[in-house]
Regions:
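Chalcogenol-based redox active-site neighborhoods
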Residues: 1-159
Length: 159
């Protein structure tokens, strides 16, 4: 799949996810350096892939999903980036993020390749949204065409 990053076309690496398929389990790193597995989370999941929490669009995006998550029942919002866990923890504290789980894919890039969001030119994740039901069936996917743009919040939150 192709997206653009600051206007430059980039071919994403990894397996493109489609609605209806079962989402792959993946490994990541929690902010406390502990192991994270998608399979450890029960119920519905909204997975938010971002390039870096330290950018204005990613910052605004995670804040928006954090605010929305306050009203969710039975849905866990997971934000994943290549940021180091220490940076994620610092950013969450400074931004008051307390309803979203942030995890890092820096170590294995497991999520990057299993969900088809790896940007090889910069070593970051593309911006994407995945909504999974309680059985990990994919019910919504958005690979944002321009990585520096916002996702369609309304569609993602309605999914």
């Amino acid at each position: 799949m192709k997206v653009t990053f600051a206007g430059t076309p980039v071919e994403l690496q990894g397996n493109e996810i489609k609605v209806g398929q079962t989402a792959a389990d993946f490994n990541a790193v929690k902010n406390d350096l502990g192991a994270f597995k998608l399979s450890d989370i029960k119920g519905r999941k909204l997975i938010v892939a971002v390039p870096s929490l330290d950018t204005s669009v990613c910052d605004a995006e995670v804040r928006r999903f954090n605010a929305a998550a306050a009203g969710f029942k039975g849905t866990t919002v997971i934000t994943i980036s290549m940021d180091l866990p220490f940076a994620q923890s610092r950013w969450c504290g400074a931004a008051g993020i307390d309803k979203v789980i942030t995890v890092s894919d820096y170590k294995e890039r497991d999520f990057a390749f299993k969900y088809g969001v790896y940007l090889p030119n910069v070593g970051l994740l593309a911006r994407a949204i995945f909504v999974l039901d309680e059985h990990n069936k994919v019910t919504y996917v958005e690979y944002v065409p321009e990585v520096t743009a916002h996702p369609d919040y309304d569609k993602a939150l309605a999914a």
